[in-house]
Amino acid sequence: MKDRLFVISQYVLPHHLISRLAGCLAECRLPWVKNTFIKWFVRHFQVDMREAQIEEPTAYEHFNAFFTRALKDGARPLDSTPGAILNPCDGAISQLGKIEQGRIFQAKGHSFSAMELLGGDHERAAPFMGGAFATVYLSPKDYHRVHMPVSGTLREMVYVPGRIFSVNTVTAQGVPELFARNERVVCLFDTEHGPMAMVLVGAMIVASIETVWAGLVTPPKRSLKTFRYDEAARAPIHLEKGAEMGRFKLGSTVILLFGPDRVRWAEQLGPLSPVCMGESLGQAAITAAASEAIELQ
């Protein structure tokens, strides 16, 4: 009953208003406000400050600076196995598997459209049909910067407006098409393993999503926006494996998509498996160059 009431509340709460108010609080620089908030957060969520570059909670200029804190060098070593697909962030696996009949598994009894997740464009979604997906949920205590699982060159970024339901286990089980309904930023890369999509999904209390190349992408612009990065007028944006690509100012979810027969997820990973950025999420099955060579034979 408690879970059902929580799901029902998600439909009636003013999501964007709550998130924008939270964003204002998170940017407050008044010492007594931000220090009280940060210290409560560290204590309540048991945040390990020993791995942060700045260990003293009150040394941050505001809550958002604390929340997107950098870690000490070496805190997240990158798996050096050839062909390893890295976890893009800290968190827990929500789901991972195969994209079947154009749909991505969300929770028992629920799935969502890969095409809708990517902004409703058939051509954009086509390379991922029959491919692989991994959904990683970032809890409040986690490190909230997002990194590249493989090296890639940015081709397109799409801001997709939407609701901002919470994205915990309860709502995943109770809100149909959750991740394809929430506000999100879709980033498409060309990699040696073929096309890769990284989708940063917003949620209630997520005040904003940023990328390293565009800065602030949300709060909402109320309409779908597409930004091309493969045009002659723009300098190519290439990010190396393990490099930061974006961050959440208050938590949420990252969804990775690869094309068919490109990656194999690690067998030991499943729903609720804890993960850290830089660990192996899986292994590349075949490189794009090798695939093209096979097709030419």
Swiss-Prot record:
InterPro entries: PS_Dcarbxylase (IPR003817), PSD-B (IPR033177), PSD_type1_pro (IPR033178). The keyword Heme does not apply. One of its GO terms (biological process) is phosphatidylethanolamine biosynthetic process. The record marks G251, S252 as: Cleavage (non-hydrolytic). The active site is at D90, H147, S252. It catalyses: a 1,2-diacyl-sn-glycero-3-phospho-L-serine + H(+) = a 1,2-diacyl-sn-glycero-3-phosphoethanolamine + CO2. It comes from the Bacteria. It is an enzyme of class 4 (lyase). The keyword Cell membrane applies. Is synthesized initially as an inactive proenzyme. Formation of the active enzyme involves a self-maturation process in which the active site pyruvoyl group is generated from an internal serine residue via an autocatalytic post-translational modification. Two non-identical subunits are generated from the proenzyme in this reaction, and the pyruvate is formed at the N-terminus of the alpha chain, which is derived from the carboxyl end of the proenzyme. It is a peripheral membrane protein. The modification Pyruvic acid (Ser) is found at S252. Belongs to the phosphatidylserine decarboxylase family. PSD-B subfamily. Prokaryotic type I sub-subfamily. This is Phosphatidylserine decarboxylase proenzyme. The gene is psd.
